[in-house]
């Protein structure tokens, strides 16, 4: 039996979400239509509202409803520090630690030549202009510790160092509360190499 075209369109739309394959999308679509139509309508309204009202901050490139986000407008932040992250979600995680009081630049991705993502797609020129504004003294590279994140950090670091900026990278190591027997060998090796005196 062929499913209705409206349902097929919903399944296809849900597949656009990261990590959602055809089966998961179909389960979600059927759940929304069978058990949670109010939730489906709320989801639809929220998606429409977000697409109509969210834009990228002119300074840091994160999502905002205004031209400039609240973080960039906060005069109590240290404008000499610029932390580079891959996504707005990464920025939020750093903010939740309440340990960083500088400004941000959100790449909206990471270098991945195999996927067609180069410097242009991660707003590299905007980052260089922002970091070279004469105010920024240190750039903290907080890209993820994946192969692509490491390649992105290396590329950005080389370019920004050549412009006379101090470039630092987040430390890596054993997570807080982590037990060595459950940590992978690469993480333990990096923690050993990055050890510091007490």
Swiss-Prot record:
Keywords: DNA damage, DNA recombination, DNA repair, Metal-binding, Zinc, Zinc-finger. The keyword Phosphoprotein does not apply. A zinc finger (C4-type) spans 57-72. GO terms for molecular function: DNA binding; zinc ion binding. The keyword RNA-binding does not apply. Residues 80-175 form the Toprim domain. Pfam families: RecR_C, RecR_HhH, RecR_ZnF, Toprim_4. SUPFAM superfamilies: Recombination protein RecR (SSF111304). HAMAP family: RecR. May play a role in DNA repair. It seems to be involved in an RecBC-independent recombinational process of DNA repair. It may act with RecF and RecO. Belongs to the RecR family. PANTHER family: RECOMBINATION PROTEIN RECR. This is Recombination protein RecR.
């Amino acid at each position: 039996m062929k499913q209705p075209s409206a349902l097929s369109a919903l399944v296809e739309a849900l597949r656009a979400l990261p990590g959602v394959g055809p089966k998961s999308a179909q389960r979600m679509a059927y759940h929304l239509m069978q058990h949670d139509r109010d939730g489906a309508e709320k989801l639809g309204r929220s998606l429409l509202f977000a697409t109509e009202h969210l834009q990228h901050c002119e300074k840091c490139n994160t999502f905002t409803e205004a031209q400039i986000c609240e973080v960039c407008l906060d005069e109590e932040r240290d404008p000499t520090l610029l932390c580079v992250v891959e996504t707005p979600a990464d920025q939020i995680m750093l903010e939740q630690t309440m340990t960083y009081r500088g400004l941000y630049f959100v790449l909206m991705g990471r270098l991945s030549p195999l996927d067609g993502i180069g410097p242009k797609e991660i707003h590299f020129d905007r980052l260089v202009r922002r970091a070279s504004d004469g105010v920024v003294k240190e750039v903290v590279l907080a890209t993820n510790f994946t192969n692509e994140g490491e390649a992105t950090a290396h590329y950005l670091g080389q370019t920004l160092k050549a412009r006379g900026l101090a470039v630092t990278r987040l430390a890596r190591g054993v997570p807080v509360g982590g037990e060595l027997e459950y940590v992978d060998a690469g993480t333990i090796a990096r923690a050993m190499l990055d050890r510091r005196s007490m």
